[in-house]
């Protein structure tokens, strides 16, 4: 059992590591923006549209949620100004007044809520529909999935009324997993602590009270279902993972899984299908590893990515690079992996830093990372949020992913 002293020394270590990280940011990043949110967000996702306001910055939008103590919770559409290539960005610039660093021209990386929508309980997860990004689904501490069209709400709520477009019924407990079908508009899957996956078509006829019953309820897991994801290319295929350590592959046309794999040695918390390859997917687990799978032969794990020091809760493929994958979780780190480097020769010194496929470690958070999102418009730009209210937008230095020999002398970069 952890004592108070343990917690304090852990905080001290995290703080020391953060100081080293901050000192090294000019060498490691082309962009770093840190913002303290009013409340922690358990979820983050970039919206796909951007606005170019001037030659030196563009306006991007993020879907966030709140996790308040006892106050009203909100689903948030927030805007953030991002530098263009013409802007001069200084990753080392620190604003003591704001407690933020990173700046360029008149833009300081501030995240400003554009629209606040009342939400019942904290927002466990929020994801937009790919075919119509103004439609957002959320998971909360209730068993229901809520659907909103954010264009139908004022920028600030007039009162505390909770008024989603739809309430999707089918679960008996809360959960986190949520996935819109990338090929068929309106189809959505949800995973729950009740050991099931529910499937809805939001184009269906809802009742007068705005409630819509699940079209199918899939039962195959023997414990909590942690995550669910549609296959990116096959519109009727999806995967689910859970605390029973299993990966299940399903087809909508049948109510039993086509494949059931013992995927990890502990709970499986997340999965993601590769957007470029119809056979490749990744799973992340409490066993501290990310596993790589080939749907053509699920009996054999293709590869195990090992470098995290604690449970993994998120895994996501880059939307721009077929071989790039990122993972994050309880160890406060976000790891970026490059599949093309698996098996490359390493010096003993390099091996101490991790396997050859470990491209980058983002060490800017001092608490568990709750969620992250790859920017769909800006390659290599990531937004990550942690339990201590911190939101960071960052991009690793291009000499890291361009395989250019690092010009920073090794003795100038401190090790954490």
Swiss-Prot record:
Q: Name one Pfam family in it.
A: CAF1C_H4-bd
Which InterPro entries does its entry note?
A: G-protein_beta_WD-40_rep, Histone-bd_RBBP4-like_N, WD40/YVTN_repeat-like_dom_sf, WD40_repeat_CS, WD40_repeat_dom_sf, WD40_rpt, WD_repeat_RBAP46/RBAP48/MSI1
SUPFAM superfamilies associated with the record: WD40 repeat-like (SSF50978)
Gene Ontology process terms (BP) = cell fate specification; chromatin remodeling; embryo development ending in birth or egg hatching; embryonic digestive tract morphogenesis; mitochondrial unfolded protein response; negative regulation of vulval development; nematode male tail tip morphogenesis; regulation of DNA-templated transcription
Answer yes or no on keyword Signal: no
Repeat positions for WD: 118-158, 170-210, 220-260, 263-303, 307-347, 364-404
Q: Which UniProt keywords apply?
A: Centromere, Chromatin regulator, Chromosome, Developmental protein, Nucleus, Repeat, Repressor, Transcription, Transcription regulation, WD repeat
Any one GO molecular-function label of the UniProt entry:
histone deacetylase binding
- Predominant subcellular localization, coarse grouping: nucleus
Give the record's GO CC terms. Answer: chromosome, centromeric region; DRM complex; ESC/E(Z) complex; nucleus; NuRD complex; transcription repressor complex
Subcellular location as annotated: Nucleus; Chromosome, Centromere
Q: Give the UniProt family note.
A: Belongs to the WD repeat RBAP46/RBAP48/MSI1 family.
Q: What does this protein do?
A: Core histone-binding subunit that may target chromatin assembly factors, chromatin remodeling factors and histone deacetylases to their histone substrates in a manner that is regulated by nucleosomal DNA. Required for hcp-3 and his-1 stabilization, localization of hcp-3 to centromeres and for proper chromosome segregation. Synthetic multivulva class B (synMuvB) protein. SynMuvB proteins are required to repress the induction of vulval development by Ras signaling and probably act by forming the multiprotein DRM complex that represses transcription.
User: Can you state the subunit structure given in the record?
Assistant: Binds directly to helix 1 of the histone fold of histone H4, a region that is not accessible when H4 is in chromatin. Probable component of a NuRD-like complex, composed of at least lin-53 and hda-1. Interacts with lin-35. Interacts with hda-1; the interaction is direct. Component of the DRM complex, at least composed of lin-9, lin-35, lin-37, lin-52, lin-53, lin-54- dpl-1 and efl-1. Interacts with hcp-3.
Cross-referenced PANTHER family: WD40 REPEAT FAMILY (PTHR22850)
Q: What is this protein called?
A: Probable histone-binding protein lin-53
**Species lineage, top-down?**
Eukaryota, Metazoa, Ecdysozoa, Nematoda, Chromadorea
């Amino acid at each position: 059992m952890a004592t108070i002293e343990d917690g304090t020394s852990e905080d001290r270590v995290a703080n020391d590591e953060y100081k080293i990280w901050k000192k090294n940011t000019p060498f490691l990043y082309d962009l770093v923006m840190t913002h303290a949110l009013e409340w922690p967000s358990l979820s983050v996702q970039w919206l796909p549209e951007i606005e170019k306001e001037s030659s030196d910055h563009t306006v991007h939008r993020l879907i966030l949620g709140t996790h308040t103590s006892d106050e009203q919770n909100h689903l948030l559409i927030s805007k953030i100004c991002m530098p263009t290539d013409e802007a001069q960005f200084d990753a080392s610039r620190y604003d003591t007044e704001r407690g933020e660093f990173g700046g360029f021209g008149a833009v300081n990386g501030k995240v400003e809520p554009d629209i606040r929508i009342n939400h019942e309980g904290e927002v466990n997860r929020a994801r937009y529909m790919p075919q119509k990004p103004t439609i957002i689904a959320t998971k909360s501490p209730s068993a229901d999935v809520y659907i909103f069209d954010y264009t139908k709400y004022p920028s600030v709520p007039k009162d505390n009324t909770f008024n989603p477009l739809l309430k999707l019924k089918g679960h008996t407990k809360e959960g986190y997993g949520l996935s819109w079908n990338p090929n068929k508009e309106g189809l959505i899957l949800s995973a729950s602590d009740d050991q099931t996956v529910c499937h809805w078509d939001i184009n269906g006829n809802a009742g007068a009270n705005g409630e819509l019953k699940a079209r199918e309820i899939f039962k195959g897991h023997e414990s909590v279902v942690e995550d669910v994801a549609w296959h990116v290319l096959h519109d009727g295929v999806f995967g689910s993972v859970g605390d029973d350590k299993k990966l299940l592959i399903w087809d909508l046309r049948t109510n039993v899984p086509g494949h059931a794999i013992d995927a990890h040695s502990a709970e499986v918390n997340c999965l993601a299908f590769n957007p470029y390859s119809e056979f490749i997917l990744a799973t992340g687990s409490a066993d501290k590893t990310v596993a790589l799978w080939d749907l053509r032969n699920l009996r054999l794990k293709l590869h195990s990515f090992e470098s995290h020091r604690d449970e993994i809760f998120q895994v996501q493929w880059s939307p721009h690079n077929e071989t790039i994958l990122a993972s994050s979780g309880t160890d406060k780190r976000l790891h970026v992996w490059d599949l093309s480097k698996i098996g490359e020769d390493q010096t003993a010194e390099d091996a101490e830093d991790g396997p050859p496929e470990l491209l980058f470690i983002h060490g800017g958070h001092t608490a568990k990372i709750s969620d992250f999102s790859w920017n769909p418009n800006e390659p290599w730009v990531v937004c990550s949020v942690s339990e201590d209210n911190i939101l960071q937008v960052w991009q690793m230095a291009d000499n890291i992913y361009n395989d250019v020999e690092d010009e920073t002398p090794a003795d100038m970069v401190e090790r954490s």
